[in-house]
Amino acid sequence: MKITFLGHAVFLIETNKKILIDPFITGNPAFPKDFSFDKIDYILVTHGHGDHIGDTVELSKKYNATVVSNFEICNYLQKKGVNKVHPMHIGGSFNFDFGKLKMTPALHGSGIIEGDNIIYGGNPGGFVIYSEKSVYHAGDTGLTKDMELLRGVDVAILPIGGNFVMDVEDALKAVEMIKPKVVIPMHYNTWDIISADEEKFKKGSKQLGVKCIILKPGESVEI
C-alpha cells in the first residue's frame, strides 16, 4: 500500500485502486504544483468544508470516480452533476472492490458555503480503509474517546494544527488511545492559524512507542 501526502488533509491511497481523500487542490497553498493524477477510482470526502470537499465535483467527472461521503453531501454532489456516489453514515461499513470501508465519528462541522448561504452537509466523519493494511484518516476532528475503538490500526492519519482540530497535545492523546503501528500528521501549517510543531508530535509519538512519519507535500511512503 502506498500513501502519498498532497498537502493539508489530502491523501492518495494506492492499493489495487486509487483512493483520493479530501481533494482540496484548487487554492491549496500546500498542494505540490508538479503533481498530477493519472487515475482516480474513488474520492472520499470527510465533510463539507471547502478545504476538504474541494475539487470533488471536477475530479469525479474527469476521472469517472465514485464519491463516498455522508448522505447529505452525496445528495448535494448529485445536484452538481456527479453521477457516481456512494452515501454512508457514521458507524456504517461497506465492502468495496478495494476492501472494507468504515465511516467513523468526527467532532467538527460540515456546512457547505455557497455565497451567503451555508448548506447543511450532514455529520462530519473520518474513514478507516481495511485493505492490504488498515488506514484511519480522522478527517477534521477534536479528541474523542471513540478513537479507543480503533485501537491497533496499522496507520493513523491525524490532524495536529489546533484551533479547528486537535492540537499536538490532544493528537498525542489520540495516538495513545489508538496505538497504531504508524502515525502521520496532517492539517497543520497550511496557514498560520493552524501552525504546529510536527517534530514535537514525532518526539511524543516515539515516547508512546509509535512510529511517526512526517511527509512533505508530494512525498510517499510504502506501508
Curated annotation (Swiss-Prot):
It comes from the Bacteria. GO terms for molecular function: hydrolase activity. Gene3D superfamilies: Ribonuclease Z/Hydroxyacylglutathione hydrolase-like. Keywords: Hydrolase. PANTHER family: UPF0173 METAL-DEPENDENT HYDROLASE MJ1163, UPF0173 METAL-DEPENDENT HYDROLASE MJ1163-RELATED. Belongs to the UPF0173 family. This is UPF0173 metal-dependent hydrolase THA_544. The lineage of its organism: Bacteria, Thermotogati, Thermotogota, Thermotogae, Thermotogales.
